């Protein structure tokens, strides 16, 4: 749903973009993390081959895991691209005047730093500045930026069923931290975070 909404914003803003459609496969982050190196390389090679057939200046992704894989792991396999997370692109478009916001949200929210956007790639400010541009008062959780708390998805929690001996999932701890701030909105910038915090 996030990808569809970003595409709608880009279309309304007159940005020239395209999608690969059925030729786009998983970037391979998850299979690589569980040790399927051969499958990762196969996916990467297929993606690189298909990407090379396209005319583009940069790749924009709505998933920090994919962002990290394309930016930091594909170059070793011959796929060296300019890659952006959508929060960076949208902020650039707002600040350049290509996107005009007709109204502000006027809400307070906290923001959860996705591991593969923040901790592994140092992107902390773009999502926060984007929120502020949209009229969001940012209320930081105690653990933020470099000290943010992992939702657990990247460590495999997204694939596990709850067990009787599991007292509390990492995502539940994080939600409690956010609820303690007294804000009504919890903002994320990663599809795995959306899954873990839903």
Language model: regions and residue ranges:
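Iron-sulfur cluster-binding electron-transfer modules in prokaryotic oxidoreductases
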Residues: 1-198
């Amino acid at each position: 749903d996030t990808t569809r909404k970003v595409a709608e914003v880009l279309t309304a803003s007159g940005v020239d973009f395209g999608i690969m459609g059925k030729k786009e496969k998983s970037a391979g982050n998850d299979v690589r993390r569980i040790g399927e190196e051969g499958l990762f390389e196969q996916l990467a090679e297929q993606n690189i081959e298909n990407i090379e057939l396209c005319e583009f200046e940069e790749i924009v992704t709505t998933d920090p895991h994919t962002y990290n894989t394309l930016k930091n792991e594909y170059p070793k396999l011959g796929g060296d691209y300019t890659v952006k997370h959508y929060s960076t692109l949208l902020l650039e478009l707002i600040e350049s005047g290509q996107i005009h916001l007709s109204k502000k949200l006027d809400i307070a929210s906290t923001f959860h730093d996705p591991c593969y956007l923040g901790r592994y790639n140092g992107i902390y400010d773009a999502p926060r500045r984007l929120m502020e541009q949209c009229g969001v008062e940012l209320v930081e959780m105690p653990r933020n930026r470099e000290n943010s708390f992992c939702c657990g998805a990247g460590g495999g929690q997204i694939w596990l069923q709850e067990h009787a001996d599991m007292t509390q999932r990492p995502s539940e701890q994080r939600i409690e931290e956010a609820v303690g701030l007294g804000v009504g909105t919890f903002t994320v910038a990663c599809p795995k975070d959306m899954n873990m915090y839903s």
